[in-house]
Curated annotation (Swiss-Prot):
Domain WAC intervals: 23-130
Function: Functions as a component of the ISW2 complex, which acts in remodeling the chromatin by catalyzing an ATP-dependent alteration in the structure of nucleosomal DNA. The ISW2 complex is involved in coordinating transcriptional repression and in inheritance of telomeric silencing. It is involved in repression of MAT a-specific genes, INO1, and early meiotic genes during mitotic growth dependent upon transcription factor UME6 and in a parallel pathway to the RPD3-SIN3 histone deacetylase complex.
Domain of life: Eukaryota
Domain DDT: 423-483
Name of the protein this chain belongs to: Imitation switch two complex protein 1
Disordered: annotated span: 130-153, 275-374, 482-508, 627-655, 803-825
Organism: Saccharomyces cerevisiae (strain ATCC 204508 / S288c)
Organism lineage string: Eukaryota, Fungi, Dikarya, Ascomycota, Saccharomycotina
Keywords: Chromatin regulator, Nucleus, Repressor, Transcription, Transcription regulation
Cell compartments where the protein resides: Nucleus
Compositional bias ranges of the Low complexity kind: 132-147
Remaining remarks: Present with 2610 molecules/cell in log phase SD medium.
Amino acid sequence: MVLYKRKPILLPDPKPLPLDLNVQVWHIEETGEWFSSYEEFLERFDFYTRHHFTCEITGTSCLTFFQALDSEETQFKYVEDRFPLKLREPVARFLHFNGIRRLDALVEKVYARFKNDFFPGEVVYLRKQKDSSTTSSNSQQSTPQPDDMVEINSVGNPGLPQYQYQRRYVIKEKVQFNATINPESREIVMPAHTKYMLIEEAASSNKSFIVDQGQIYRDRSTFTKHLIKCFFKITLQRASSKMGAPWCVKPEYLAMYGLTMEWPKDMLKYKEDEPVVARRSNSANVSSPESEKNKRQSKSSGKSNTSNDASNKKETKKKRKPTEVNDSENNSSEEDKKKGQNVTSETHSKKRKKEANEEPNTENVESVPTPANAEPQAVTITSIMDDLALPYQHPPNIFPNLTYYNEKLECISLGSTKLSRPFDSFGKLLQAYQFLNTFGSKICLSHFSLDQFITSLKCTDPYELKGEVVLVNIRTQTSKEQEIENNGLPMKNKAETTTEEDSENPSDWQRNSFIRDMIMKRNSDKVEYKIVHDDPASDDILDNINHNGSALLIEVFTALLRLFINEEGDWSCIVVENWIIDDKGVLMERKDERGEGEAKQKRNAHGYFLQDKEKIDNLKDTLKENATEVQKESDAKNETNSESDSKSDSDSEERDPKLEKCLNYRNVNWIERLTKRQFNNSYWLIILLGVLEDCRHLPMYTEFIDSFIEKIIPKDISATQLPKQLWRNFCRKLSFSDKVNALWILVDLVSHFSPDIKAAVDDSMELCGQIRSERFKVARELKTEAAVLSNLQGDLQAIQEKLNKTDENTPSADGADKKDDSESNSEPIDLIIIEKKQKLIEEQDKKVQALQSDKNFLDNCLFENDLQRLKPLGLDRYGNRYFWLDHNGVPFPQYPAGMNETPKSNNSLSYHSGRLLIQGPKASSAKFFLNVSDEQLSNWQKIRNSEGISEATREVFGISKTSSGSYNYVENGIEVELLDSNDRVNPLIELTPIQKKIMDETPSRLLLSPDQWYCIDKLEDLSRIMDWLDNWGRKEHDLLRQIRPIMERIKSSLSLRDHALSLTAFTKNEEKLLKELENNEFTENELNVDSMDVDDKNSGVKSEVDVQVDAEEKREAVIDEKLEVIADELMKLDDSSKTRNVLNRIQELEDQRDELLEQKKSIINSQRPGARILARSERKRTKISRGNKVNKQIEILTDLVNYRHFKAMEDVIAWKNVLANSIWGSSLRKNASGNKRSGVIETVDDKLKDIVGQTSRTVTPAPN
């Protein structure tokens, strides 16, 4: 039966004949359909002629209906003509409820089982024997030989090939003999065999012969694996829809072969639990593919055709649902539609079964105003279908736990209350990072993680290098009063806070959210905590690239720039010079004399070839064939182009003097610097400017390159400090997005035009093919050795069972003397055999483990050396794409020896990205899967950029989430609840795909653009995503098939990153700082000491003693200040040279110090003891203690806020380009050049030899 979308199709029932039999109709002969209108006939015929059908017997796909039908008829006739009739019933009995599930394995099993087994009635031929005198002892007469035959076989089926000098024989009888066993030694004397009685097919003689199975054979063309497989396709089907169900004979062939559908006891678990409702739904009704689009459109029609009156809408829903359910029982296509709308499933998946078995909450059910006939009848989902056609369950509450990167490249949780703008160039950052690590061995760049790459990029920002500062302010009574007077603006205590400039620069960073929230929660009426930016890094810190973390980013730029020109000065990455865009938006090469003249002028002006013309000509073959047509169109528009060219030329003239001065700094052209590999001291930026200037003619880069050059070139070019000026402008004036775009342009150019990268891809394909070959050999050897190990274990078990039986049957002591001596000596012999078997098993087990280790190692090598373009793992139901960067081309992550200890650096844990990435759908996918228009997408994007995702979702799609957790939909002023706070769907509303997506992802986290990326970086979030994906949906089924084989690798990668970054726990240093913070908490007395001073001042008139004490305290404070000034000056004089004037000044200061100390001592002695004086002294000590705690808390909290960021910077600083150091002895940014050191593995054969050398195999592959 022809298959459509992997389901057997059922032709529609024939229509009744028209009343007027003379009317002309259009007829499709193959299906028997007729049509009264040509449009209907043409639509149906067009459906049949699409290449969407599959031949069920051969499995050939992409056929038209007629081709598939013809293929099936041809194959069916082929099986009927060739496959022996007498062999069909035994084969069918063997296949019926067979335990082998895989079809290819079953074919091999049947071929091996029946190759030498024959049945009465079959036509066979005799084999030629070496010794013609040999006859069977049991024969009635001698067996005939083919050489004795002189007649040509001409009797029988004329369709079969006729063999000369051979006669055809028919098996008359078949007798099977059991094996003959020696009763004493228990050895097999004669194995089991079969005898056949043959008669000649021609009825001319009555001779019969007795032969065994080794003397006869079938015609080779009548018993082949292809015929067996075709017979399977015709005869067999799955016994049930359950996973792992066995094969069984189709109902129409059961009576023919004398079989029944009685299930074996060991297979009853695969039997259907209950009869499937609407069995016809398993077969695809022959309807045009437009019906599927109509299904999607019907779901969205609820939004476009909503009535202004809500009550009318509900009434129509009530009337429509019962009729739709009734129609679904009679029409399979209508049933499929209902499955996609409101029909719930009990056996949809494991989680659907669980929900169906749970008893509903009666309280919740009563609160929903659902009509009695509104609930449709539940049906069983038995096949994979469209994801959005599955019944909607409830929001998974997964997306708030995921993370994303904001515009400051901070990893922020989506559940954060303050959602900032995402990083728009994150996709380009991932492309550049994946390219750098995939081709790291080719461009001499060691591996680094995605976190290290992002941290190095952030280390080029002056504020990131200094971090943040936590300010602590003790609020006094006067500051509170002033705060009220200034309408809530707090005044700062000058004694215990920093300057006003720091407080005017509050931090808007969101990293390290737990510590940040902990600090802000410490705010109270008496203490104020603030987090502000520290002063930006100075020029000295920015220039010290070896110790500020930016060395990794510079090494990356340097590695890419090296690919454009080799050390001989030849261009190795050739970009076609002149491009234009045709009317269709396709980039084309521009062939005109004007472009060639400009190239010559550029070449003559600088003295260097910007591009090699001969190599450019070789690339012209790859361009479009219609370039000449574009040339004609461009000639017609020369006038308009000349005006724009003149404007661009005038703009370039304004830029050219400064740019030329940079590119020819110190009279050395940038090409010469690149040839000589002069990257050190920020010369790489001059080379970068030259490469970007050379690619400015490409229209997709022009706007950015102009902006980049304008920002990075200084206004006043220094004759000696230009590279440092460029580097400081690169750090201060360029945003993270600008730096990523500059890097991405280099990656894009190299990946498209570099022959080195293309050669690396070709070598990778060749190497992977040889690794697969080695892995196949290891797997084959592993299978053989595992079978030997299994046999040894079976022999050992049999011997042990034999010993156990002898122990059980040991006679009593009275009969022990009657036992023979031979039997008493058998036990030591068996024990010796057991010891030998155990030794053999241990040795064999080591072989198996070594081969298994080799196979795993080769699997990892295959992942590491596969440099193919990274592809998404698949799509979910809403078109979101899933990526895992560790899938190919990167080293396999390895756990360290001690996972319980916190690593000193992330370099010891070789993880790659450590997360699963989700990208929003493309515009085409959103329009196709979600039925969203271009206008809605553009409006949503504009509002999202200005007001946020939540507001854009509410204005464009009319859906918002209330404070109670319910989702409301507003259209034409009518508000309808789609989902209540208990996650129950409104049964009166048919949800559209976009509505389901908004409720699943929440309005504030909606993924509707390819620029949006979410990260899954925790194991529990990964488990939730896997549980949410539905195996019965087409797209998610394919996605799960891709994720499950690499699930363990994904989990290990996430665990490695979690352990390296301590995402879910504090490190030891953080715990130590938190403990110190607890020891420096303010006491109640320290917080209230200022209010005690105010109470004393407000208590009334001071006494003479109080006045005297205050005066003495002021004198003492003045003396303390003078003593501090003298101490500072003495320290400076001690460090200077000891001249006479300096010594005299030191003596004077020491005399002044002694005098002030005497005055202070006299003041202290003059104070008389008293309660008021003691209280003042106590308050003074309390203030000093509080001040010390304030300074300590500032230090501890500042360290806590910056700890993880500074730790990441330390990891990046510790990164070294080990690969470049091993090849040239220095990093790429330090002008690594010259001949490579010996021992560098570059060729495919050397790489394969190195890989095989790390396995236990002794045979190495020979070079080609």
